[in-house]
Amino acid sequence: MSKPIQMERGVKYRDADKMALIPVKTVMTERTEILRKPEWMKIKLPADSSRIQGIKSAMRKNGLHSVCEEASCPNLAECFNHGTATFMILGAICTRRCPFCDVAHGRPMAPDTNEPVKLAQTIKDMALRYVVITSVDRDDLRDGGAQHFADCISAIREKNPSIKIETLVPDFRGRMDRALEILTATPPDVFNHNLENVPRVYRQVRPGANYEWSLKLLEKFKEAHPDIPTKSGLMVGLGETNEEILDVMRDLRRHGVTMLTLGQYLQPSRHHLPVQRYVSPQEFDEMKEEALAMGFTHAACGPFVRSSYHADLQAKGEEVK
């Protein structure tokens, strides 16, 4: 039996190095079929990238991270060019190693106690009115990072009194009650936690997570704050069927979730899970109709939709696809 790899704190493991640490492996070979992207998946880059560079510079200046960059989001150019970003707190190294995700794995450093203040000032400088705060998984922390979320929310509101805050939280595995006790004392305006995909493929797609646990997290927050919207998102193209997606949507409604995002999974590198199908815009439209019929008040469904894609418009109920 081989010895476990001793990871050095603060070192990022990506691509092949990260995938080598995953117990349930998908082995990619030269014979593995790579699906060609359909026309509707082609992205047009903005002609002027000055705003993009400005946001990147503001992030670097204050030692902050965006999930847009760390997870290689396909919407980065569009969102940055519109002056929006999803901030990723608690560092850029995740204690999980999901094979669909491009965020680095490893042993993260201790949380930056100055991050809440730096984040609040950056948001004020950018004159944002709606902000999404997410994080890597921090299984190394006793509260999973919940107190750091609360500190960030408080600091942001102190400097930006009229801002709306959406949190996209991890599952707080083994720490749910402790985390919820902290977060219910300093709640966001929207509470988001992604299920990512259907339970049948969880062991391969989301190792270390539990489908029922994630549903319970969403339900418990909603019970504590019935007036605050809860939200969840899924990726399609990882081996699930449309009927399985509909079943997950029904589960979300049974657990009080009212906001939904559905988007196409895209393979970050050849080392990550391959795309098994591309879902057409028409199918996404049909899923949105099903979601609204189930009672979701907001449903953003489309090939490029991501959990925080135009989150401000999603929260207003405007169409996003």
UniProtKB/Swiss-Prot annotation:
Its cofactor is [4Fe-4S] cluster. One of its GO terms (cellular component) is cytoplasm. Its main location: cytoplasm. PROSITE patterns: RADICAL_SAM. Pathway: Protein modification; protein lipoylation via endogenous pathway; protein N(6)-(lipoyl)lysine from octanoyl-[acyl-carrier-protein]: step 2/2. Keywords: 4Fe-4S, Cytoplasm, Iron, Iron-sulfur, Metal-binding, S-adenosyl-L-methionine, Transferase. It is found in: Cytoplasm. It catalyses: [[Fe-S] cluster scaffold protein carrying a second [4Fe-4S](2+) cluster] + N(6)-octanoyl-L-lysyl-[protein] + 2 oxidized [2Fe-2S]-[ferredoxin] + 2 S-adenosyl-L-methionine + 4 H(+) = [[Fe-S] cluster scaffold protein] + N(6)-[(R)-dihydrolipoyl]-L-lysyl-[protein] + 4 Fe(3+) + 2 hydrogen sulfide + 2 5'-deoxyadenosine + 2 L-methionine + 2 reduced [2Fe-2S]-[ferredoxin]. Its EC number is 2.8.1.8. [4Fe-4S] cluster 1 binds at C68, C73, C79, S308. It comes from Photorhabdus laumondii subsp. laumondii (strain DSM 15139 / CIP 105565 / TT01) (Photorhabdus luminescens subsp. laumondii). It is an enzyme of class 2 (transferase). Belongs to the radical SAM superfamily. Lipoyl synthase family. The lineage of its organism: Bacteria, Pseudomonadati, Pseudomonadota, Gammaproteobacteria, Enterobacterales. GO terms for molecular function: 4 iron, 4 sulfur cluster binding; lipoate synthase activity; metal ion binding. This is Lipoyl synthase. Binds 2 [4Fe-4S] clusters per subunit. One cluster is coordinated with 3 cysteines and an exchangeable S-adenosyl-L-methionine. It holds the Pfam family LIAS_N. Residues 80-297 form the Radical SAM core domain.
